[in-house]
Regions:
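Glycan-recognition and catalytic cores of secretory/periplasmic carbohydrate-active enzymes
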Residues: 1-400
Length: 400
């Protein structure tokens, strides 16, 4: 319910519609009351098995931390409402779950799943940073610092160059280097750790994550792209373009670094990744890493959101046009029903493009797709304003 509630939050912010606000409150209230249901053995097993990632139910994208992030946004949006306190208390309860109940003790500090992936421990830390910055708690900041020290222990010098954080697991024969599981996401977290602590170690290791990404980047006809996977038969051959394992997520890392570190390499990296995506024919043409999927996680909704973010930075018509072209594809792939509702049939799994589903969630379905269409609507109306979560480094408003 959290992702759908977040969509209704956005509808409320844009339209001021009381019916949408009530739906958002209902979803948020349910999430506040039932977030622990994600920890029930049968529910945790279902979530982990569905995504094929053990421990994902604890993380920040498809687990408990994601519920906490949405509750924080609910407390902000409904700050003048009596419900805001309920959402705040629930978000802080999730914070205590991470600090007091589920944390394990490593050699240098606390951790949870043992995976540095943003989908796992990295995302949990992003949630805790957001919680600290929203409500303030010096004790929580000290906990984050200790967890950051443990996180640094998971870095590994790569023979390819730079530093690697392999969220796929140390025992696996392959490496996912992009945003949700790899060094791009780890570098992003480290940049935030530097931002809130001022500890230069985090900035230095983040730079070395970028060195690793540069070392494994594959030149295209124009620009470069980071492979979906390192190791295995399809190494260096599949390039996702979406948020999870591809360009739309990975370029968030250099975007954030560009706000903290005055080095031209960050803008260059952003442009190279965008060039690489267009060199593969995106957004209109499918490729090995852009199959018949349009969702926020893997497809056109996530790409449009990212390019709208880039447009907010410099106002380039190029970014706006790319996002609009993605929006055209979202509208063209929409299925309308007799009752006036709409859904999007697409293939969630790249390796099973024939298996279509009509999911409703934010990362994996209609809520995220419709949110992106809402952004494009505001862009056309010339009143674009999009408050950002912590995994979203772009300005809230376009540069004027």
């Amino acid at each position: 319910s959290a992702g759908v509630a977040y969509f209704y939050l956005k509808l409320t912010e844009v339209t001021g519609n009381a019916e949408f606000a009530e739906k958002a409150r209902c979803g948020l209230s349910y999430a506040a009351a039932h977030w622990r249901d994600l920890l029930l053995p049968e529910q945790a097993a279902f979530q982990d098995n569905r995504e094929g990632v053990p421990g994902v139910h604890l993380g920040a994208h498809m687990g408990v931390g994601g519920v906490g992030l949405v509750l924080i946004e609910g407390a902000k949006t409904f700050a003048e409402s009596k419900d805001a306190e309920k959402y705040r208390r629930a978000a802080q309860a999730i914070g205590r779950f991470y600090t007091d109940e589920s944390a394990q003790q490593g050699e240098s500090g606390p951790y949870w799943t043992g995976s540095p992936a943003l989908l796992m421990d990295g995302g949990i830390m992003l949630f805790l940073i957001a919680l600290y910055e929203t409500f303030g708690d010096q004790q929580l900041l000290e906990f984050i610092k200790a967890a950051g020290a443990q996180y640094l222990r998971w870095s590994a010098e790569s023979p390819r160059g730079g530093v690697d954080f392999n969220g796929a697991g140390i025992e696996t024969p392959f490496d996912w280097p992009n945003f949700a599981f790899g060094s791009a996401g780890s570098g992003y977290l480290l940049a935030h750790l530097f931002r809130i602590t001022g500890d230069a170690r985090y900035l230095e290791v983040a730079r070395r994550c970028a060195d690793f990404l540069d070392a494994v980047a594959v030149p295209q006809k124009r620009g470069k792209l980071i492979p979906h996977k390192l190791g295995g038969d399809d190494e260096f051959t599949v390039f996702y373009l979406g948020y999870c394992h591809g360009m739309a997520g990975t370029l968030r890392f250099p975007t954030l670094m560009g706000t903290l570190d005055n080095d031209i390499r960050w803008a260059t990296m952003v442009n190279q990744l965008a060039d690489g995506a267009e060199a593969l024919g995106a957004p209109e043409h499918m490729s090995a890493g852009l199959w018949n999927t349009v969702c926020y996680c893997c497809g056109h909704a996530g790409m449009a959101h990212t390019f709208l973010g880039l447009y907010c930075i410099d106002g380039s018509p190029r970014w706006r046009e790319f996002a609009t072209r993605c929006g055209d594809i979202l509208l063209g792939s929409m299925k309308t029903h007799a009752d006036g509702s709409a859904s999007w049939p697409f293939a969630w799994e790249r390796v099973h493009p024939e298996e279509l589903s009509q999911r409703i969630g934010f990362y994996d379905g209609a809520a995220g797709i419709a949110s992106t269409l809402l952004e494009l609507f505001m862009l056309e109306r010339d009143d674009y304003h999009w408050p950002r979560m912590i995994d979203d480094p772009f300005p809230e408003d376009p540069r004027r």
